[in-house]
Amino acid sequence: MKATTSLATSCRRLLLWGVLTLQCLFSTAQKRFTADVEQQAEKILSQMTLDEKLSYIGGINWMYTRPLERFGIPRLKMSDGPQGLGTHGPSTAYPCALMLAATWNEQLATEYGSALGKDCRARGVHVVLGPAVNIYRAPMCGRNFEYMGEDPYLTSRMATGYIKGVQGQGVMATIKHFIANNSDYDRDHISSDIDERTLNEIYFPSFRAAVQEAEVGAVMSSYNLLNGIYTTEHPWLLKDVLRQQWGFKGILMSDWGSTHHCIPAVKGGLDLEMPAGSKMQPEELKYYLRTGDILSLIHISEPTRLALIS
């Protein structure tokens, strides 16, 4: 029954995402999860078929969510990234996040995010896949330039400003990579073994600030394992910490190709598999629904609802 509840939750979140994004198409103001938006999502959810729900929790065409054309919900267009739009044609290259963090200027981070948000709107991008806030632990990590250093306080302040700037333009920001993605080498197999105190003092602060202060719309999980469990299927990390302790209401998506198993990801709390539903496959989910082993219809609805209102 627990796995059932997770899928229901993910469907609702995805629906909330879609409805909220539809509103943002006509306004640059940051939208929030209002009662009206929730009601719209619930109405759509009640009319969706099982196939529509199962398909909606996986992306399509590399950088898009699925449209729900009969409900007027467009596909959501995503783009990397932290330092400018890295997809959908030539674009402006912004200074890297490390340079931005070196200014210690949160207002500048907000202006940076606002400019990036305007760039997104000009290109029809609904969701930008940034900021990235991995804490520096491995100096040889090839993506350190994308991040904001090793100081959890500085990273929290700069990421919060960045997110407020982006979302102030009616574009969804995505904080990544949750969590402890300290090296890109062999990242699909590395386990970052970290005690709870270190997580709370070093790794969590920037993500917690993004959720509680900036109300970030999306969180992207990482490729690695945390203490022997993949972050895309880690109930303590995704449900207990992110959802319950911090009160995150947005979408939790996988990094591209970082979903490793279907049912553990569903039970763990993952909402959206990107770039496609290759592990959380509709046919496999249908099988478990039919057999009644660990899934039922409730489990499919919440990710869809959240995507609609976001």
Over which residues does each language-model region extend?
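Bacterial Sec-dependent N-terminal signal peptides
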Residues: M1-R32
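Glycoside hydrolase catalytic-domain context in secreted enzymes
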Residues: A29-S301, R305
